[in-house]
């Protein structure tokens, strides 16, 4: 069937800021779909409020709108662009809910826009819990007994009938938001009231519990001709009761019998047909009772999902790309498989390896905060809480598991020092469970006992036991020949771990292994278990005999990715590495990407010339460098993860491209940087470095309180705090510093109260420096720069101070010898400027600044790293200032951490960001707020909590707002961590926790009242910017 030529222009809705449950996987799938549709001759309009994405690059879609994802702005875009169709299945839950709202409000019909990929009825059947259960009954498939309820009373009535525990699943929410498990009536009242509030349609499914059952997923695709293919099966290592996004998962499924698998496949095909997903992909989840084999259907996502990104990376089958092409009328048998070029997309992938995904969490960021429910528990439930994930590929489950664990950048023996009885308490679902299980296996706990405590299938527990037994044997039987070495390395044991077991250093073990010629070989991900030749170089390491990867003789560059997304190191760094790959490819280099994150564009098989899906450890990276022999490695674009490898790589004789390691070290080493600033005459706040808690207490009075204290070498403000007296400092040293594994030195800085903070991104070639963007923070000093709203260009900083900022930035860049990007943070008090820190690497603001000024900074940085100058790259304007304002606001997933009271401080907690652009700074800020989900009211009631707020109250009253002391408000302003803030979070109401935020918000509200709505594409904004 030829593609539809009646459609010319297609609108794609992105998923908005990155948050828990909706991360970089939608940037990956959206980017793939835009490229596919444009390649097929369609015009594509994209709307997304998230600037930190590849999909919002102005070169990708024909028209790109960085606008809030709400009905008003979308209607404005529909009116302006007049697309023929809307593809709603690529923007996660946000995109799907918006598409449904546009349809239900009659807005799509008004502008004659057709929904393609999934019709409204199919979305409703897949997403509405009751409709889905009815559909399953029609095709004789079992679902857990459940009832859709609209009130707590109905829920209690049903739970009394089926018995506790019950599971609560709110309708149309993301990552299980608002859901949970209730073990008794009191818990049901709590979970269900929250779930009903958070569901956009205020309903939730209460269903019988299948806790402890095995959980499986199938990724399914269907075309117009009713061809249905199963892309892969995925098995959750953690049993039912843990959200699949928080489970360790493995593909293909390991413990299903052939009969069970065939039954599941038949069910999946029947489901996608019954729900009516005419074209595209769906993810269908099943539970299997391990005792009886009873199989029930849990739910489906009639869209591209987190699991489809994982399935794409696990198999090499580009689900989002194919889904986009099916939506415009192609059939599966008409689309070629990019990897083999011989087989069509209707051939189901076959894989001869095992893939393991492990989630990454951030409980430690939220635990120190006040909580209305007591201490924050790290228990994993049906509500997703992980912020990122790592994927690894091996020939066996054991090898893939161990590679994935080291990809998390955490010691496999993290719990070695914990007492056995404490470990036994860590067997409930929590981020440490896999470490506790392995540690207890080392201490001889039987598999059966572990199974009873965890309900993890005994097959997985036996696999872990075999790893532990091999480690034990190794202690007394060192490897003596190649076979021994290959056996131990094939289990996924690192040189470092083998060294620990034998009492040797990592370098010594590496030398012994290499002397015997034992090095990894590289295999290819080819979708067909080596039945056809693979043309797309997508590789993983293993310790076998046959190598499938032959390095070319071309000049090549290795770019190190950033590993799993976490708070402080988000998709912004993936953006920088992808841009570097594209720029170096255009310049004629062969590009080699090393990364372990399945959610991202960097690990798409067609981003770099070669992709190594490997953990970012020194051992794994050195193996690749020795195999490929590149001209050098770029380690400064992926955040702290690759930066930590820079020293080891340089010591091993690897050439680091761009900024030399000496410059990185000089900027990060506190004393060296202080000496440099003194030499250059650049002021810094008073500060000292202590090597121990005792020294910190002695030096503190010399610097003077209040102090900003933190360990050296951290990202995202980990363990950073403002302390106001000696008592607070003592508490910090005992509660925050003492538990740190590495015991780094302690930095004590004088805290400048009331200063305006600035963030500066610059680009240097060693001779000239481009000061690309100066951003003013809305929140004052003391709030982590990654959690502050920012404006570019600054609004409240005197020109005299800005001149100093440019001058200091240039001097720092040239003296440090930066070749590439540099981020500097300043504090401004009046016209005085103090430098806080400098980081000679890509920062998290690079995508935002690039979008704001229309200059691809990361691309230029990569070309400078291989020897180009700013002049040669055509950069003329070294101080670009756009003739409009760009604002950035952050998103913090407060809702996912029960009871936590929102509070901003020096430790970063945001997961994502939104952007607003306007001629007026306050309107840009208003748009950024809307884009981040903070719907500031234009009128209504405001409640204030805290002392000394008379001036703000007067301003809000003057603007026509009524003040209230009650619960019925439209906006909450609380400058103290009050439990009312938690209630606002759970009711989805806007709230503000800083004086500056309250002031900016009021200015924004006043401007928004006057001006009404304006939408404009990024391409149009860039027309106005002076071309660098």
Curated annotation (Swiss-Prot):
Location of the region described as Carbamoyl phosphate synthetic domain in the Swiss-Prot/TrEMBL record: 550-933
Keywords: Amino-acid biosynthesis, Arginine biosynthesis, ATP-binding, Ligase, Magnesium, Manganese, Metal-binding, Nucleotide-binding, Pyrimidine biosynthesis, Repeat
Allosteric domain: annotated segments: 934-1028
Residue positions binding Mg(2+) 2: 299, 301
Binding site for Mn(2+) 4: 837, 839
Residues involved in Mn(2+) 1 binding: 285, 299
List of residues binding Mg(2+) 3: 825, 837
Binding site for Mn(2+) 3: 825, 837
Start and end residues of each ATP-grasp domain: 133-328, 674-866
GO cellular component: cytoplasm
Pathway info: Amino-acid biosynthesis; L-arginine biosynthesis; carbamoyl phosphate from bicarbonate: step 1/1; Pyrimidine metabolism; UMP biosynthesis via de novo pathway; (S)-dihydroorotate from bicarbonate: step 1/3
Catalytic function, reaction form: hydrogencarbonate + L-glutamine + 2 ATP + H2O = carbamoyl phosphate + L-glutamate + 2 ADP + phosphate + 2 H(+)
Name of the protein in its database record: Carbamoyl phosphate synthase large chain
Organism: Thermus thermophilus (strain ATCC BAA-163 / DSM 7039 / HB27)
